[in-house]
Amino acid sequence: MTGVTGTEDTKVIESKINELNIDKSKPEKTNKVNKSDDVDNDDVDNDDNDDEDNDDDDDEITESGNSASSSGDKKKKKNKNKNKKKKKKKIISIDSSYPEGIFPEGQWMEYPLEDINSYRITSEEKRYLDRQQNNKWQDFRKGAEIHRRVRHKAQSSIKPGMTMIEIANLIEDSIRNYSNNDHTLKSGIGFPTGLSLNHVAAHYTPNTGDKLILKKDDIMKVDIGIHVNGRICDSAFTMTFNDEGKYDNIMKAVKEATYTGIKESGIDVRLNDIGAAIQEVMESYEMEENGKIYPIKCIKNLNGHNIDDFIIHSGKSVPIIANGDMTKMEEGEIFAIETFGSTGNGYVLPEGECSHYAMNKNIQHLKPPSERSKQLLESIKQNFGTLPWCRRYLERTGEEKYLFALNQLVRHGIIEEYPPIVDKRGSYTAQYEHTILLHPHKKEVVTKGDDY
């Protein structure tokens, strides 16, 4: 991926310096983000790039160019500048960095079967057909580039002591800004931001009023979904803040297992074979805590999945254990390859207050039981369609006093709920995930970045 660095602010200063024949001795600061990130599009909180800093520089240039200025005037200006309130630089839409609509490709990988791979590479017809889907691939690549920048912001900003609401808002506001679009069905958030802690493996995002605070010894799964025209990029990573390396082994196990799953994936590959390879890697690791050894287990009832337009789980499940599923991956399919490791039972159950919801794809024969639930369903259709959502997103659309109607829709099977899923208390879980595109000749790990 190509690096792009924003330079508009420094050009203003340089032109003033040239006019005054003053040497510029201080080098410009830049921030490297996944090779493709530019300053304009990422560092919202970078004070070195604030507009107020540029005002300070202009004042200094004026002072040094005007020999008649008194030292008293200089001091007043400096004091005035010190008292100025810093402004945060707004994130700019991702489109401004790629005005031609051509976004960075992901990591290309060969398919595992050499005979299949050889056929695909030499088939000009297949390559031609793949090019016909360029708009589709560009949507995924755009979403992936937003994902890389958003998670860079998250990784550099999230600290113990923050509330889960603050963390969720940080991530989701970044997605909205990069997407530059408030219409959820055009582009933006693909599903609720997962921020599951410790023994909670997935499907936790804070509801309004949640007071939960991130602690230094927590292990947090950050699952972010971004879509462009319904093409969903699904990618997750795990964050820890313990300085003693307590979670190093479980994170290494899960990351290596995920990349094993990606390596084994491909056209005509059986899902069982992918799961068997993942399981072998994952269960070769163990974790030590307080002198006790815990084997790291695959969470057997959690899987990867294929993705369709506006549908995050489209029907095929990619197991993380050998489960006997002889279903094959097919050309043109999109898969989220994700693995979960645990020091607990390796099996999760629903527990806790629900925050995740999605509309049932097959509701033609189902009718809302009340006028209020009918109104709520129409709002859900207009704002989210079949994309998953959470209560906070519903409230953002202006909905109030909706819980009774929402529960009615759930009871009648019109809306499906996805509560947090947990292993046994006291255990630890980790997750890594990438979205892959199965092109005719190679696979593309579209969400791959420098971080994972």
From Swiss-Prot:
EC number, as in UniProt: 3.4.11.18
* Needed co-factor(s): Co(2+); Zn(2+); Mn(2+); Fe(2+)
Q: For this protein, what reaction is catalysed?
A: Release of N-terminal amino acids, preferentially methionine, from peptides and arylamides
Name of this protein: Methionine aminopeptidase 2
Kind of enzyme, top EC level? hydrolase
Gene Ontology MF: a single term: initiator methionyl aminopeptidase activity
Cofactor binding, per record: Binds 2 divalent metal cations per subunit. Has a high-affinity and a low affinity metal-binding site. The true nature of the physiological cofactor is under debate. The enzyme is active with cobalt, zinc, manganese or divalent iron ions. Most likely, methionine aminopeptidases function as mononuclear Fe(2+)-metalloproteases under physiological conditions, and the catalytically relevant metal-binding site has been assigned to the histidine-containing high-affinity site.
- Ranges annotated as biased composition (Basic and acidic residues): 8-38
Function comment: Cotranslationally removes the N-terminal methionine from nascent proteins. The N-terminal methionine is often cleaved when the second residue in the primary sequence is small and uncharged (Met-Ala-, Cys, Gly, Pro, Ser, Thr, or Val).
Q: Where does the UniProt annotation locate this protein?
A: Cytoplasm
